[in-house]
Amino acid sequence: MSSSSKPFLRALAGETLTPPPFWLMRQAGRYLPEYRATRAEAGSFLDLCYNSDLACEVTLQPLRRYGFDAAILFSDILVVPDALRQHVAFKEGEGPVLTPIRSAEDLSGLDLSGLHDHLAPVYETVKKLSAAIPKTTALIGFAGAPWTVATYMIEGSGSKDFAKAKGMMFGQPELFARLMALLVQATGDYLIRQIDNGAEAIQIFDTWAGALPEDMFERWVIGTTRTLVERIRTERPGVPVIGFPRGAGYLYKRYVAETKVSGVSLDPSVPLHWAAAELQPKCTVQGNLDPLLLVAGGEALDAGIDRVLKALSKGPFIFNLGHGITPPTPPDNVARLAERVKGWKG
């Protein structure tokens, strides 16, 4: 039982609340006209991530509109490789482009020593948000999980099949293990520093967890996440961690049991009845409305919201999407969702 006045933190501590707390992944984003204006003011996407005043502003924008129970730091999972001195850029219409890590020589060019100096503007954003958000709103810090971040670092961009990343994992296992060890260290350092600046909970995004076979999932998704959870629990006791092993399917059950996360975020493919029976007795569940229902709106949206609420609100639960809000989402549909979740009587 949590003594917190913040519903989001109470739910993560195991309380069942009616209505459940809610926030949405990518709640600060291109679907909001005020975000697009601030983004234009910033210049590049990374400039926005590293401008603490503007990053704070875009984090607060959806709170003003919708009254979410949590704010999530506005940043990107690729600030970690950027801070490790890998070249990272975001190209309009293309997404992230990185100078790929393919060899021991490439790996030797990465440097942990400047991590905190490089990420100082992000920590400043966290500090400003901690002071700016409403008293009942929780502040979530986050990072990409080592496997997911490694896919971008090795591929040099997004990928459909992760051929280069898996090629290193299977064909150069020692090199891959060295990269993952560096990412576990850097990610842990980064998250601890976010907590020290005011983050009250952490979410670890493993967007490409579902791409791995079970033995590699066990080592590189469960194993690395467990290390991060244990470190946070030891060094900053009381700060809950939410894991998001997107696409993990049946392996969600092992992930929850073996990482010991406080909460788990469910993608839209996870059956609700199964999540309620198999996952919710062990940790708080978060999710899992399909983001495209939020684009569609109308009765389909209402029915989708109700289906999730009916299935999961009998135990510790945080309402969310199964992945991030997409740019075509009408802001009025988000208002409709907020009103419906806030009005839920069980």
UniProtKB/Swiss-Prot annotation:
Gene3D superfamilies attached to this UniProt entry: 3.20.20.210
CDD domains from the UniProt entry: URO-D
Marked site (Transition state stabilizer) residue numbers: D76
EC number: 4.1.1.37
Entry-linked HAMAP family: URO_D
Function: Catalyzes the decarboxylation of four acetate groups of uroporphyrinogen-III to yield coproporphyrinogen-III.
Protein name: Uroporphyrinogen decarboxylase
Gene name for this UniProt entry: hemE
